[in-house]
Amino acid sequence: MNWGLVMQDICNVRCDAIVNAANKIMLGGAGVDGDIHHAAGPELVRYIENNVPTIGVSEADEAVPIRCDVGMAVTTPSFGLQPVCKAIIHTVGPVWTGGRKGEAKKLAKCYWSCLDEAKARGFKSIAFPCISAGCYRFPTNLAADIAVRSVCSWFKRNPDSDIKVIFVTYTVADNEAYENIMPYYTGK
């Protein structure tokens, strides 16, 4: 398994695909989602509106179409992010509500779905933010542990894969969470 950890803006990480911690409507939002949409440009929203089918409507507002549900992965071109990356893999992480509603399992599914998507598309490298740790209030240490554990378990089920995984953090605290947990899974 080939992986790394960097502290920088995910929009500047050179790789085949960056992962967007998206919302269900996929049209941009706060945090990483907003940053990626801003960097990709308005073509990304137009592409999503015209090419990504809706799978339902919001429970809060039936006029709001859902294009990606929790744990799913949807790939789009990267538009303004090229040549930094070829594609954006959007996934919707769970909102933290205390840990009693299957949030950990749902978060793990995000990583597995993104890696499955990367493998299916022949990508050789993928950059992950700490999904759900920002606006969705997942405790950073737990989110980092689930991220690393999920990636390790995916590679155990896909030993032939040579995808490079890059964990991308924005803050020193986030970076330290990964630095503290990664040795438990690498034996170093």
Feature-to-residue mapping (PLM):
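Macrodomain-like recognition of ADP-ribose-binding/processing modules
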Residues: 1-188
